[in-house]
Amino acid sequence: MTTTSAFMLNVRLDNVAVVAIDVPGEKVNTLKAEFAAQVRAILKQIRENKALQGVVFISAKADNFIAGADINMIGHCQNAQEAETLARQGQQLMAEIQALPVPVIAAIHGACLGGGLEMALACHRRICTDDVKTVLGLPEVQLGLLPGSGGTQRLPRLVGVSTALDMILTGKQLRARQALKAGLVDDVVPQTILLEAAVELAKKERLAQRTLPVRERILAGPLGRALLFRLVRKKTAQKTQGNYPATERIIDVIETGLAQGSSSGYDAEARAFGELAMTPQSQALRAVFFASTEVKKDPGSDAPPGPLNSVGILGGGLMGGGIAWVTACKGGLPVRIKDINTQGINHALKYSWDLLETKVRRRHIKASERDKQLALISGSTDYRGFSHRDLVIEAVFEDLPLKQQMVAEVEQNCATHTIFASNTSSLPIGDIAANAARPEQVIGLHFFSPVEKMPLVEVIPHASTSAQTIATTVKLAKKQGKTPIVVSDKAGFYVNRILAPYINEAIRMLTEGERVEHIDAALVKFGFPVGPIQLLDEVGIDTGTKIIPVLEAAYGERFSAPANVVASILNDDRKGRKNGRGFYLYGEKGRKSKKQVDPAIYKLIGVQGQSRLSAQQVAERCVMLMLNEAARCFDEKVIRSARDGDIGAVFGIGFPPFLGGPFRYMDALGPGEMVATLQRLAALYGPRYAPCEQLVRMAERREHFWTNGETDQGN
């Protein structure tokens, strides 16, 4: 229990009560069940003070309002009834705030999410700052839940049903101007005058009722509502493939509230919250949330990180440009790019310009902020400006002698403490460091494409990499907004190693006659964001298959792909989306056109293209190989823990989050079931499915990857 209250009441001389929210000992405000008594005590004082003109809720934290409710509360619930009770308690508290007899204003700066936004919705008006840190949303769906403290009922009545459905079903976060346009907030002001603006609004005796736009009023009526909900159900089912029960319950609860009234809506919301909290999907999604939070706190090693004030990048291509952007614009670090010609430097600069200009157009940042961030990036065709760089990231071609040459040049032109980080996806870091004068300062830092979107990076120390080099590189990755996992220096590292057999099997099924769209649809239905064939097209067929010979040389035949198929496709100049033709055909750039499977692909690989396997059989063949390889990586200590393996797969390749990652999924299936399934597939399709020793041992001992002490709760 906290001894200091998280909610402090101060009555100003002008008779406006200011309630400051400041959870003791925490960087971020989150709502906990034990705060209810504190809030009620303050509400009692407010009701008893007849001289009060209004109330303002504001955060005392530097950059957040309330980031949500403490998710650990849900994990403590033993059954659906306890979770439902938790929701009803939240609903009651919000109702008491809404029922205050004077104007109540939420003054919002920073993150206002989940339970924080539900509290703001219970206030009579909302004002927020124009700061980039200010975002408002209800992200509970991302944890397999719905808003449980009245959010499903208040939001549709405030912003309209279609806007509310979009926000709650996606968990999207609105920036200040978007929130103002939607009617979620009443005003947007600079942070310096937030409190005074809120106080002035609180002093107004009568707050005008906001009128919904005509479109929203039509959709709220019986006919418009019926049409809207029918369309939303259909679209949501297509998107979720039935894997996320929370989305269907969200639609039901919002519809109930609009059709039968708020009281029925609140009842439905609390019941749905309780039931969803007990679903395996919500438990898995919460586990992913806690695991990712832990990974972000993990320093990578016990050593303190070295200096990290500026970064160099070798290569201005697609990866180099993306790395420059996340380093400068996310991390706030000065970046110097070296390329063999000015064209490469200009490409990297344009990469950042385009991303920042899009933000300016969408009014996410001001032009002055764009210029400030761009000023952090500079370039050169030689090593001028590199002498003081603390870390240099190499993003040149996958050529070992070239990368070794880069190491030598950096050691010659940079400081003695400078770290050399290679963005290789396939070459051993130990080989890259083989001729280094300071091998302890050489490390792998594997980004995924597109760099600005993919959240994961693999940090790969080789045998001689120092603990400080690891810590410094992990620190950089976090500054870049990435989630880093430390993996061993073995062929394919972790993510590409478990991805390769999955894609290989999809190609193998193509050679057996299965249709491209059938294979992709089967894996999307299983829960992946895109199918394996489409993924190969997106990555680039030439790029995606380059690692297969490396893995086959290291691990043997289980990594062999139908070589003639890959060769035939590449020889036909099919690289995927980047050149407009792969397994799919793509329209002209800039034109919206649906991708279509190229029927010529079947003739090219010598098959008819007639599917014989069920979607479940297709998914099983691909996924079981991925799981088996993940278990091998665990056994060989390629990954440090099941936690890192789950996060790597979910964030790196889109492994279905509602399954919790490959290791939680294998635990759910049970090692005995895993071994039996792999043995059955091995009998049908060959020894590549033979269960690895790790799984066989675990089946014999009835062990799990996640130990009993590791729950779906945070520490």
UniProtKB/Swiss-Prot annotation:
Region (3-hydroxyacyl-CoA dehydrogenase): 306-715
Pathway in which the depicted protein is active: Lipid metabolism; fatty acid beta-oxidation
Residue pairs linked by disulfide bridges in the UniProt entry: none
InterPro entries: 3-OHacyl-CoA_DH_CS, 3-OHacyl-CoA_DH_NAD-bd, 3HC_DH_C, 6-PGluconate_DH-like_C_sf, ClpP/crotonase-like_dom_sf, Enoyl-CoA_hydra/iso, FA_oxidation_alpha_subunit, FadJ
PROSITE patterns: 3HCDH
Reactions it catalyzes: a (3S)-3-hydroxyacyl-CoA = a (2E)-enoyl-CoA + H2O; a 4-saturated-(3S)-3-hydroxyacyl-CoA = a (3E)-enoyl-CoA + H2O; a (3S)-3-hydroxyacyl-CoA + NAD(+) = a 3-oxoacyl-CoA + NADH + H(+); (3S)-3-hydroxybutanoyl-CoA = (3R)-3-hydroxybutanoyl-CoA
A GO molecular function held by the record: long-chain-3-hydroxyacyl-CoA dehydrogenase activity
EC number(s) recorded for this UniProt protein: 4.2.1.17, 5.1.2.3, 1.1.1.35
Subcellular location: Cytoplasm
Keyword annotations: Cytoplasm, Fatty acid metabolism, Isomerase, Lipid degradation, Lipid metabolism, Lyase, Multifunctional enzyme, NAD, Oxidoreductase
Region (Enoyl-CoA hydratase): 1-190
Regions annotated as coiled coil: none
Biological process terms in GO annotation: fatty acid beta-oxidation
Pfam families in UniProt: 3HCDH, 3HCDH_N, ECH_1
GO CC terms in record: cytoplasm
Sites annotated Important for catalytic activity: E118, E140
Primary localization class, coarse: cytoplasm
Family membership noted in the UniProt record: In the N-terminal section; belongs to the enoyl-CoA hydratase/isomerase family. In the central section; belongs to the 3-hydroxyacyl-CoA dehydrogenase family.
Subunit structure: Heterotetramer of two alpha chains (FadJ) and two beta chains (FadI).
Function as written in the Swiss-Prot or TrEMBL entry: Catalyzes the formation of a hydroxyacyl-CoA by addition of water on enoyl-CoA. Also exhibits 3-hydroxyacyl-CoA epimerase and 3-hydroxyacyl-CoA dehydrogenase activities.
PANTHER family, per database record: TRIFUNCTIONAL ENZYME SUBUNIT ALPHA, TRIFUNCTIONAL ENZYME SUBUNIT ALPHA, MITOCHONDRIAL
Name of the protein: Fatty acid oxidation complex subunit alpha
Species annotation: Salmonella newport (strain SL254)
Record gene name: fadJ
